[in-house]
Amino acid sequence: KAWKGGKTREHWLKNGKQKNPGRLNDLRHIIYKSADQNSKKSKINLGLMLKEGLLKENIDGEALLWASSRISKRPESRKILIVISDGAPVDDSTLSVNNSNYLEKHLKSTILAIEEKSNIELLAIGIGHNVGQYYSKAITIHDVEELGGIMFEKIESLFD
C-alpha cells in the first residue's frame, strides 16, 4: 500500500473532494501470528514487525475495531488484546481535510466501546510515548528492545 492516502485519497480527489470525508487512507491489517498458529512456526513473521517501510500510517481506531472483531469470534472465554503503539493515531491524508482530532476522537470512542461493551481486555504498551491518556491499562517503554520482557511480564501479571 502507498503512503499519503493511497487509492482511497485518489478516489476522493477524483470525485469532487467532499468536505469532512472521514478516513482518507488505505488500510493494511497484518497478521503476524494467528491464534491457532504454532509460535515456533511464526517466529520469522514476528521479526517482520520491525521491517523498515512495511508499516505506514497509524489509524489506531480502525485497527482496534478490526482486531476486536477477530478476537470476539474466538471460542476462548478470556480475550486479551494487546496494543503496541508509538503514540497517537496519525494519518496525514485524513488529518489534512478533517478536524485535527478526528482520529484521536475515533480511537477514544472505539476504546470506550470495547472496554464497556465487550468481554475483551485491552492492554496497551506505548513505545516512547505514554498511551495512558487513551487506555486504562497502559505502560510505557522507552526502547523497542524492552518489548519482549515487558510483554511477558504483563501477560504473566494477568494471571496472578
Where are these regions (language model features)?
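Acidic, glycine-rich A-domain
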Residues: K1-D160
